[in-house]
Amino acid sequence: MRATVCLPTYNEKENLEPMLRALGEVLVPGDRVLVVDDSSPDGTGEIADRLASELPFVDVLHRPLKEGLGPAYLAGFWRALADGAELVLEMDCDFSHRPEDTRRLIDAAAGADVVLGSRYAPGGRIGNWGLVRRIISRGGCLYAQALLGLRLRDLTGGFKCYRREVLERIDLDAIHSRGYAFQIETTYRALRAGFRVVEIPITFVDREVGGSKMSRSIVLEAIWKVPALRLAALRGQLR
């Protein structure tokens, strides 16, 4: 099945070229990488354009504003669907997600509708995170599990693979999450729609180049968004 990897970028000039070249080593003919750049002031968008002219599997989508992870992914999803992708992947550009693991997610999609690259599934692990970041991540997953009644272990991770049918069925226009709540919301909507979601273990390593995008507003959004999703589901308003 033809896959498109959506790669959102904001100030990733050091990481973009090595990431794209690494993905080129593991993707197969017909697969694409879509760089979704939010007008990075460091010139990431220009680097993406140069690489798209050199690497035949790379496309670039320029967005005029930095609006957050969720809107960037949604724009990428619509573009990938319009271009005929059968599988659509999310991953980070900073090497937190290993390029070679994209193949594992794609292969796992043969038996599932959504595949989560899981830090907390048996065999998964996290490298070089401090205690506070580990607590925030694990606590966020447990919080979402409890309120939404889910057994999946990693609900906030951003390494995912969707079958085309999932993105066509869930109401993408109703998704307004900007930060990591986006990951919880898309998975929850897929489950509510009856799709099969599985986890495969990955090794997650924090970025070595560039700055983290984590912020207080991202955490606060997830805190209120999770109960809002549960309430919408109880009212029959979630698709």
Language-model-detected regions and their locations in the chain:
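Hydrophobic helical membrane-anchoring modules
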Residues: 1, 149-150, 172-239
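Short, well-formed alpha-helical segments that are part of the catalytic scaffolds
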Residues: 12-26
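Acidic helix N-cap motif at the loop->helix transition within catalytic regions
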Residues: 14-18, 42-51
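Residue-level signature of catalytic and energy-coupling elements of molecular machines
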Residues: 23, 76, 94, 163, ...
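Short beta-strand/loop segment that forms part of the nucleotide-sugar
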Residues: 30-40, 61-62, 91
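A conserved acidic beta->alpha catalytic loop
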Residues: 37-46, 95
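Acceptor/aglycone-binding surface of glycosyltransferases and processive sugar-polymer synthases
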Residues: 61-82, 87, 99-180, 207-224
